[in-house]
C-alpha cells in the first residue's frame, strides 16, 4: 500500500536574515563601490550649466528623485545639495515652494526676494534663509545681476516622504521642448509637460503629498495653558509655525565676528544661535592664509565646501585632492580631512555646509587631531 505523502511548508525567511542580506548587498557592497568611485572634488569646468524651470544653474551635488545611485555618482554625499545659480541683470527666477528649507549665499551682485508676499533685499556676502514651505522667488538688480550658491536637503526630504513642492511660475528663460504641451493638476497648477512623442516630463517640484495638511500647520494657535506632556507636543505645533513666520530671512554676514579657532579663522553664518529658522544646516566661512593650512579633524557628519577664492588641496583620509576657485569639495562621513592653501601670496576663502541631522541623533561632535597654522 502506497504511503500518503505530505509536503512540509518551508519556513518564512527570518526578517533579521533578510534585512541583513539586503543591508550587505545594497549598502555594504553597491553603495560602498559608488562612494569609493565618486569624485571628492567637483570641478567648476566639469559641471554643465542647465536652464531649468527655476533658474540657470550648475548642479554640483544634488538629489535625483528617481535614482539615489545617480546622486552618489555625482558626489559621495547623501544629505547636502549644492547648486550655483545665475540671474542676469533685471531677471527673476521661477516661483515655487517646497517642504525642505533652503539656504542661499550671495556670491556676487544684489537683488531681493519675495517670501510669502514680503520683500527681503540682499547683496553680495549675505546669507538668505528660506523657511520650510515658504513661497519664494528671486529678483536680480537691473545693474548687477546676481550669482547665488544654493543648498536644500531635497534628498533628506524625499526620504522623509515630504519631497517636492508647488511650481507657481516658471523662470522667464525656461522653454519647453518644441511642440510640448503643459500639464496641470485639477487646481490648475503646472505639473509638467507632454512632449510631441507623448512622453510626460514632470517638473521637479510637482506632486506634493498632503499639501493641505501641511499648509494648515502654518495657521496653528498657541495653547492658553499647558497641563500635560501631551500638551507640550500640541504647543510645539504652534512654535514650529511661529518660528517660520518670525525668523530672520537675511543674515548680514559682514556684521558677524570672525573667530580664531583651533581649526582656523572661521565665521559662523548659519548656526543654532543665529535665529534664521534654519533647522537643517550649519554654515560657516573659513579663511586660510597664504601657504597655510586648516586644522586636521574628523566628524561623523558629511560636509561640502565651495571655494570662493584661492587654490589649494585637501588631504582626505591620506589622499590628496586639488581644487581651485568655484570648485566644490565633498567630505564623506567619518573622513579625516585638512585643507591646504598652495598659493604663497593669496588667502583662500571657502564656504562650508553641513547638516545638523547628525547632531540630533548623537553624532555631532568633532575629533580634533592638529591645530591650524598660525
Indicate where each model-derived feature is located.
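A short beta-strand-loop-beta hairpin characteristic of the jelly-roll/cupin
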Residues: 92-124, 134, 293, 297-325, ...
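Ligand-binding loop in jelly-roll beta-barrel domains
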Residues: 76, 123, 132-159, 163, ...
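A short, N-terminal "cap"/entry segment at the start of jelly-roll beta-barrel domains
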Residues: 2-78, 175-279, 365-374
Amino acid at each position: 500500500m502506497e504511503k500518503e505523502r505530505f509536503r512540509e511548508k518551508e519556513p518564512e525567511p527570518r526578517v533579521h536574515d533578510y534585512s541583513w542580506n539586503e543591508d550587505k548587498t545594497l549598502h555594504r557592497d553597491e553603495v560602498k563601490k559608488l562612494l569609493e568611485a565618486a569624485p571628492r572634488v567637483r570641478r567648476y569646468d566639469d559641471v554643465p550649466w542647465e536652464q531649468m524651470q527655476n533658474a540657470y544653474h550648475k548642479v554640483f551635488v544634488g538629489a535625483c528623485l528617481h535614482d539615489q545611485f545617480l546622486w552618489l555618482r555625482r558626489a559621495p554625499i547623501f544629505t547636502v545639495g549644492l547648486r550655483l545659480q545665475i540671474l542676469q541683470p533685471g531677471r527673476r527666477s521661477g516661483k515655487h515652494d517646497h517642504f525642505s528649507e533652503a539656504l542661499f549665499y550671495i556670491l556676487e551682485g544684489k537683488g531681493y526676494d519675495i517670501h510669502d508676499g514680503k520683500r527681503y533685499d540682499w547683496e553680495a556676502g549675505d546669507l538668505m534663509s528660506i523657511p520650510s514651505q515658504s513661497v519664494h522667488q528671486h529678483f536680480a538688480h537691473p545693474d548687477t545681476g546676481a550669482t547665488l550658491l544654493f543648498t536644500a536637503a531635497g534628498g533628506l526630504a524625499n526620504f522623509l516622504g515630504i519631497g517636492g513642492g508647488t511650481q507657481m511660475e516658471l523662470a522667464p528663460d525656461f522653454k519647453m521642448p518644441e511642440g510640448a504641451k503643459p500639464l496641470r493638476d485639477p487646481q490648475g497648477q503646472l505639473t509638467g509637460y507632454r512632449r510631441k512623442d507623448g512622453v510626460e516630463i514632470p517638473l521637479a517640484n510637482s506632486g506634493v503629498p498632503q499639501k493641505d495638511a501641511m499648509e494648515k500647520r502654518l495657521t496653528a494657535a498657541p495653547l492658553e495653558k499647558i497641563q500635560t506632556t501631551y500638551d507640550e507636543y500640541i504647543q510645539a505645533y504652534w512654535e514650529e509655525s511661529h518660528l517660520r513666520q518670525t525668523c530672520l530671512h537675511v543674515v548680514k554676514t559682514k556684521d558677524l565676528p570672525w573667530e580664531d579657532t583651533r581649526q582656523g579663522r572661521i565665521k559662523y553664518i548659519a548656526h543654532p544661535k543665529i535665529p534664521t529658522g534654519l533647522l537643517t544646516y550649519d554654515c560657516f566661512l573659513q579663511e586660510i592664509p597664504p601657504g597655510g593650512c586648516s586644522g586636521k579633524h574628523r566628524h561623523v557628519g558629511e560636509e561640502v565646501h565651495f571655494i570662493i577664492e584661492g587654490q589649494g588641496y585637501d588631504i582626505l583620509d591620506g589622499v590628496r585632492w586639488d581644487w581651485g576657485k568655484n570648485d566644490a569639495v565633498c567630505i564623506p562621513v567619518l573622513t579625516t580631512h585638512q585643507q591646504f592653501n598652495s598659493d604663497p601670496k593669496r588667502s583662500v576663502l571657502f564656504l562650508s555646509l553641513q547638516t545638523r541631522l547628525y547632531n540630533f541623533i548623537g553624532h555631532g561632535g568633532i575629533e580634533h587631531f592638529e591645530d591650524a597654522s598660525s
